[in-house]
Amino acid sequence: TRAEVFDVANAVLDGTDAVMLSAETAVGRYPVETVRAMARVIVGAEQHPTLERAQHQSTPLFGEIDQAVALSAMYAANQLSGIKAVICLTETGKTPRWMSRMQSSLPIFALAEQVGTSAITALYKGVIPVYFAASTMKPSMINHLAVESVRKIAHLEPGDLVIMTKGDFVNVHGGTNTLKIIRIGDMIQ
C-alpha cells in the first residue's frame, strides 16, 4: 500500500539499518514482487540528497575512545574532498556500527576475522563486511594488506583517499584508537 511505501522510505531516511515485511504483507499473493518493490523504494530513498552528508546529533561526551575515533573518522570522511571509502578493522563490529549511524554516501568496509562479526556488520547500513585475518599477519604489513583487500572491491585508483581505523593490537575488543588518512599509491605504514 501507499502507507507501507512511505513507511519503508521514511525508515531509510531515518537511518534504519534493515527493514522487513510484516506478516500481513509477507503472506500476500505476490511476495516476490513485494520484495522487489520494497527494494526499489529503499534504493530510491538511499539516493535522496539528504543522505549524502553526515546529519547526526553531536553527543556532548564520547563514552569510549573507539567511539570517538569512529565518529571522527566519519566526520572527516564526509568533510574531506577525495575520500572514496572508509576501512575499519574490527574485532566485534562496534566501530562500524557507530560509523553506520552517521549518514554518508561512502562505503564502510568492516574488515574482520570472525565470521560472526562479519555477519553482524552485514546488517549495518552502508557497511560491507570483508574477511581479513589480521592475526596471521605481521603487524608492519596490516595497513598495506587491509588497503589491498579493499582496493579492487571499492574500485580505488592511485591518488584516491581512504580513511582507516584500527587498534594498536589484534584481538583486543574495544581497542580502536587510530585513524589514518591514506592516499592510494603512497607507501603505507
Stretches found by the model and what they are:
Residues 1-8:
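Charged helix-capping and loop-helix junction motifs
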Residues 8-31:
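Glycine-rich phosphate-binding active-site loops on the catalytic face of alpha/beta enzymes
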Residues 11, 99, 162:
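Conserved, mostly hydrophobic/aromatic
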Residues 22-23, 28, 47-58, 83-84, ...:
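Flexible, glycine/charged-enriched surface loops at secondary-structure junctions
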Residues 25-48, 178-182:
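C-terminal helical cap(s) of enzyme catalytic domains, especially alpha/beta-barrels
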Residues 38-74:
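Long, charged amphipathic helices and adjacent flexible linkers at domain junctions
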Residues 95-97, 103-140:
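Nucleotide-binding motor/catalytic cores of P-loop/tubulin-like NTPases across gene-expression machines
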Residues 148, 154-169, 176-188:
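C-terminal binding/interaction regions
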